[in-house]
Amino acid sequence: MYFINPQEKFPPVSFADEDGLLAVTRDLSPDRLMEAYYKGIFPWYNEGQPVLWWSPDPRMVLFPENLKIAKSMRPYLNQDKFQVTFNQEFEKVIEACGNVNREGQDGTWITPEIKENYLKLHQEGIAVSTEVWEGSMLVGGLYGIYLKDKKVFCGESMFSKASNASKFGFIKLVQKLEKEGVKLIDCQIYTSHLESLGAEEIDRIEFLKFLI
């Protein structure tokens, strides 16, 4: 693990430890975030900690053409129970995601600093959101970083206040991204939920080829 000063670049991701932890910084900025995503690195830390940067191996990814839609989701997709929008309520989505704990982690990792910097990237059209509505209520959503020049979407977090709402939003987003020519969706780390949607683990070196 390396401590990186604000003026320094990240070390090679091959220097990450066995858990994927690569570096620690005191700074978080839009420029630092963009450097990270283009190198296959993402931030994940708790409030009160320094910024921890990760590049796990293997890497959980979804190839859009491999999306799995369970039979139980068909009624949701064929009816009007939920409606989906894109980039309409980014701030509300990241706020709601901040109230959801990540698996195996106490507290939220979406700190005020995270919200501030991702909102700046949203204003630049780089951080994007998907909103799921039930009538006028925001019941689910997700956000991430869209590297359009690489045809890669980096998912960050999702939330759900109604059964299957976040899954509905994820499916709709993947379908949209596939139409736009996206080759890969970065899901970061393994979860059984993501696996059920068609995501798989690949070697980090294979993942990085999509960012070259």
From Swiss-Prot:
The keyword Transferase applies. GO terms for cellular component: cytoplasm. Pfam families: Leu_Phe_trans. Coiled coil: none annotated. InterPro entries: Acyl_CoA_acyltransferase, Leu/Phe-tRNA_Trfase, Leu/Phe-tRNA_Trfase_C, Leu/Phe-tRNA_Trfase_N. SUPFAM superfamilies: Acyl-CoA N-acyltransferases (Nat). Keywords: Acyltransferase, Cytoplasm, Transferase. GO terms for biological process: protein catabolic process. Its EC number is 2.3.2.6. GO terms for molecular function: leucyl-tRNA--protein transferase activity. It catalyses: N-terminal L-lysyl-[protein] + L-leucyl-tRNA(Leu) = N-terminal L-leucyl-L-lysyl-[protein] + tRNA(Leu) + H(+); N-terminal L-arginyl-[protein] + L-leucyl-tRNA(Leu) = N-terminal L-leucyl-L-arginyl-[protein] + tRNA(Leu) + H(+); L-phenylalanyl-tRNA(Phe) + an N-terminal L-alpha-aminoacyl-[protein] = an N-terminal L-phenylalanyl-L-alpha-aminoacyl-[protein] + tRNA(Phe). It is found in: Cytoplasm. It is an enzyme of class 2 (transferase). Functions in the N-end rule pathway of protein degradation where it conjugates Leu, Phe and, less efficiently, Met from aminoacyl-tRNAs to the N-termini of proteins containing an N-terminal arginine or lysine. Belongs to the L/F-transferase family. This is Leucyl/phenylalanyl-tRNA--protein transferase. It comes from Christiangramia forsetii (strain DSM 17595 / CGMCC 1.15422 / KT0803). The gene is aat.
